[in-house]
Design a protein with these regions (language model features):
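N-terminal module of bacterial RNA polymerase sigma factors
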Residues: 1-26, 30-31, 122, 169, ...
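Short, basic/polar amphipathic helix motif occurring as a linker/hinge flanking DNA-binding modules
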Residues: 2, 86-112, 177-179
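Sigma70-family region 2
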Residues: 13-14, 38-42, 52-70, 89-91
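Short, charged helix-capping/linker segments at alpha-helix termini
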Residues: 13-23, 33-53, 153, 180
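Amphipathic, Lys/Arg- and hydrophobic-enriched alpha-helical face
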Residues: 25-44, 61, 121, 170-173
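C-terminal edge and immediately downstream basic/flexible tail or linker adjoining helix-turn-helix-like DNA-binding
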Residues: 41-42, 119-123, 147-150, 164-180
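Arg/Lys-rich amphipathic alpha helix in sigma70-family domain 2
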Residues: 60-67, 77-97, 110, 162
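A short pre-motif secondary-structure segment
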Residues: 131-135
């Protein structure tokens, strides 16, 4: 039976167990990279760099993990703040640029619909993308998301409702804006 995240954290804190740290990284690196990739609008190279920075920060601050929340809640909070710090350095309100994503051949209606949804999700604010990702991809509850992003529960619920409204508008053609 594999060790729980909490047990691995305890081993890292108690004896600087590199093997336990490596296991934590292997266990969570894919989820962290995917989360960051979606926040970074599918920029895999940037997501990989941010994931590496996230795990460095995790190691440096692991003694601050108290176990009052799930380890993944704590880890995704680090990832989210790492992304926000990087984003501030790049330009806080970066415009979505369709040209950087290229045009994908419309081979099937399903592929086109999925592409439209992905592009629409990319148009949401960073915070709304994070809320959607943590809720729909990671299966976190509203309370867990609020704790992870350090936001009030009402803000999380509002972001989900407003995000749904925006997506519906963009995807049903209720807006004059095109997703392209």
């Amino acid at each position: 039976m594999s060790d729980s995240d909490t047990a691995l954290v305890a081993r890292v804190i108690a004896s600087d167990d590199r093997g336990a740290f490596e296991l934590l990284v292997r266990r969570h690196q894919s989820a962290v990279r995917n989360f960051l990739r979606r926040l970074a609008r599918n920029d895999s190279e940037r997501a990989n760099d941010l994931a590496q920075e996230t795990f460095i920060k995790m190691y440096q601050g692991i003694a601050s993990y108290r176990g009052t929340a799930r380890f993944t809640t704590w880890l995704f909070r680090i990832a989210y703040h790492t992304f926000l710090n990087d984003q501030r350095g790049r330009h806080a309100n970066e415009e979505f640029n369709d040209d950087e994503h290229g045009n994908v051949a419309d081979t099937t209606a399903h592929t086109a619909d999925a592409l439209d949804v992905d592009r629409a999700l990319e148009r949401l604010s960073v915070r709304q993308r994070a809320v959607f990702d943590l809720h729909y991809k990671k299966g976190m509850t509203h309370s867990e998301i609020a704790e992870t992003l350090e936001l009030p529960l009402g803000t999380i619920k509002s972001d989900l409702v407003r995000g749904h409204e925006k997506l519906k508008e963009w995807l049903t053609g209720g807006s004059h804006e095109q997703i392209a």
